[in-house]
Amino acid sequence: MYQILYGNQVVEEDLPNILEPWKAEIQHAIEAKLMTRPEVYSRPLRRSLKGYRKLRVGYYRIIFRIEEKTVKIFVIQHRSTVYYTTPDRI
């Protein structure tokens, strides 16, 4: 079982801007996929985001990194903006 750590900006900026039905869907995906087998359910990112991974939840993307038994989440945003925001947060 993996431990989940959220970045400050995820809690302060990303989550408040997500509608409630999507929050529930994202929370379910984190609990069902990232806490159990994140390397199986996610895909690695390339180029400047190498070393990070993404999990797709509908129109949203969760950008994170696996460090031993910890999953550190850096960004949860709509797919249209997530890749512009991510380099500033890592």
What positions do the PLM features span?
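A short, compositionally biased N-terminal segment around positions ~18-40 that is enriched
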Residues: 20-37, 75
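Arg/Lys-rich, positively charged N-terminal/basic patches that mediate binding to nucleic acids
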Residues: 1-28
